[in-house]
Swiss-Prot record:
The keyword Ribonucleoprotein applies. Belongs to the bacterial ribosomal protein bL32 family. One of its GO terms (cellular component) is large ribosomal subunit. This is Large ribosomal subunit protein bL32. One of its GO terms (biological process) is translation. SUPFAM superfamilies: Zn-binding ribosomal proteins (SSF57829). GO terms for molecular function: structural constituent of ribosome. InterPro entries: Ribosomal_bL32 (IPR002677), Ribosomal_bL32_bact (IPR044957), Ribosomal_zn-bd (IPR011332).
Length: 68
């Protein structure tokens, strides 16, 4: 089994780790609501994707109980 000849120093270890970082999410502006959303996903509030209605908005539970 191979054994390191020398111990890796703090500086070398930290320089190697500087490249592990989070990237900013790709946000796009929704044409219908003017809100930022993740790209390639349907907006939760309006249900639109690429300018087309994909999901119909369902009434919430509170609205269903008050309609009866």
């Amino acid at each position: 089994m191979a054994v390191p000849f020398r111990r890796t120093g703090k500086t070398a270890k930290r320089k190697r780790r500087t490249h592990y970082k989070l990237s900013n999410p790709a946000l796009v502006l929704c044409k219908e609501t003017n809100a930022f959303t993740l790209s390639h996903r349907v907006t939760k509030n309006s249900g639109y994707y690429k300018g087309k209605l994909i999901l119909e908005n369902k009434p919430s539970k509170a609205q269903k109980t008050t309609d009866n």
